[in-house]
Amino acid sequence: MRLIAAFLRMVRLPNLFFMALTQVLFQFCIFNTIYKNSIPSGDLSRFVLLVFASLFIAAAGYIINDYFDIDIDEVNKPDKMIVDKLIHRRWAIAWHFMLSGAGIILTALALPFAQKWYLIVANILCVALLWIYSTNFKKSLLTGNIVISLLTAWTILVIFFSKVELADAFGTENINQTKFFRLTFLYAGFAFIISLIREAIKDMEDMPGDSKYNCKTMPIVWGVNATKVYVAVWLVVLMAVLVILQVYVLQFKWWLAVAYSIPAIILPLLIILLKLRKSIRTQDFHQLSTITKLVMFTGILSMFFFYYYL
């Protein structure tokens, strides 16, 4: 039982649940609502396979990250270490390869190879990026943050591209597909930007261990104040877009959506912005990271409104 609990902590079970919830809400509140009268046969089974493929690849990524981060984690979070303390490194690397392989196989089973081969290649690339992120990108300026943010957005984009033809994805006269495209990139864009914000905050939180092992993260290279400015700019951009979006949907009388978004998404972002300036200690940045994660959650939950309004 102790090993099972350790394994679930190693693969970040709450994060995997959040990822699955994102894809499930996207499927049932957006895709199914838009295409309710024309959902192709077998769509649900393909979707389920893709969800598990995403979860396995993400779990493998968390494992390989811990595998290569043992020295840094001994400084930043010694009480939370799993690999080499509760689970042997050999078992960790074995689980990484098994889960990565399972994720790629499930992707291939979920999609017709002739039409969707590029998505199988994309998920193979995700596995490779997670490995390179853990060994190189994570310790470099901005690159690691961008990679993780792109992979976060990909959890939504992979579902979108599995359902539409690549040639028609970015330009079509079909009203439903245009609506599907816009909502996909709205949420993928939100996921990308909020991840950029959180990764930069986590870099400030992890400075003690990162600096000891010569990582070139943003706060180490540019300084904490410059990193705060970077985070603040993205926060302002995201809040501005969300405010404009609320004004836009008011013309359709989406009162409940606006009443939810302002206190549950926009206000917490403003709180992060205000707290950011005075944050100095590791605990301060940890608190900001936690609030940012909460905003990711409340943002994804807003998909529920499209089930009622579309």
Region locations from a protein language model:
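Residue-level recognition of pore/gate-forming positions within transmembrane alpha-helices
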Residues: 23-24, 54, 100, 127-130, ...
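Multi-pass membrane catalytic core of lipid/isoprenoid biosynthesis enzymes
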Residues: 51-52, 70-123, 214-251
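C-terminal membrane-associated helical module and adjoining short loops/tails
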Residues: 1-9, 14-17, 135, 153-156, ...
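Hydrophobic alpha-helical transmembrane segments
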Residues: 38-49, 65-72, 89-98, 125-137, ...
